[in-house]
Amino acid sequence: MAAFVLRRLVQAVLVMLTVAFIAFMLFQYVGDPVTNILGQDATPQQRLQLRADLGLDQPFPVQFARFVGNAARGEFGLSLRQGRKVSSLIAERLPATLELSMLSAVIALVFGISMGVYTALKRGTLLSQTLMTISLLGVSLPPFLIGILLILVFAVTLKWLPSFGRGEVLALGPWTTGMTSLDGWKHLILPAITLAIFQLALIMRLVRAEMLEVLRADYVKFARARGLPDRSVYFGHALKNTLVPVITITGLQLGSLIAFAIITETVFQWPGMGLLFIQAVTFADIPVMAAYLCLIALIFVVINLVVDLLYFAVDPRLRIEKPTGGH
């Protein structure tokens, strides 16, 4: 177990160093931070002084080492567009993105697994066929189109739910949440459903495929031959083994909820990190772009590490010590 965790940690560090290098290259080759800060009318002396202040006159390895050290402390400098610390901007926007992503993940997991099990056990029924058709649409349609359709139906036509913004939020120390008010929930429903639909359909189809394969396994047939009730066979034996490969895919998909919330946040003008990143790209705000890249990579690395540990815990084959020699 310790060796397994150590290998994963080493891999995580290597991945983060690679991402940090890519983010650092943004500062080197995408725009000129001196020009972005001082403008075109700055004198050569002012430009040289600022380059020295920013450490841009130092050797490449020194600059990269300093960048990694600052990134490890969460320091990415000042936003070129807003003139504020990037860390404070991220801290303001992160709660909104996490709140949206976590609710979307719950929706995708609860309904995806439930519907996947149902369509596997009742695959000949009309409802099962209907759910499979709807899931195909969920996988095929792009999120921005789903969001626009939901806005058209529930915000414009029926006027049941708002179409943009986060609504009323409550500050709990550094954290802000909209889940403490009805207005906040109303603003959260449409973007959460939009973000969850693709993941829900993917999880549903994956669970169904794995469930059908497991139900044909010999140990399931043996459990039925022993006279075990269907509930015990389906949920005590089949579903447990179905979730082993599902865990890996689901974990990575949950990470993508945060990484790819950009489109959903843009459609609904949700004040999260995705919208901040789009604004940073529009104005070539390199510090914000670099911070977003590193943070998303860190989230993926952490989720992947947790998924590996869960996989290790669920699948007993991984806990069997490999022989050290011989045949």
Describe each model-derived feature in a short phrase.
Residues 9, 60-76, 86, 90, ...:
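Hydrophobic alpha-helical segments of integral membrane proteins
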Residues 15-65, 158-180:
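Hydrophobic alpha-helical transmembrane segments of membrane transport/permease proteins
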Residues 40-55, 132-144, 190-196, 232-249:
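Hydrophobic alpha-helical transmembrane segments
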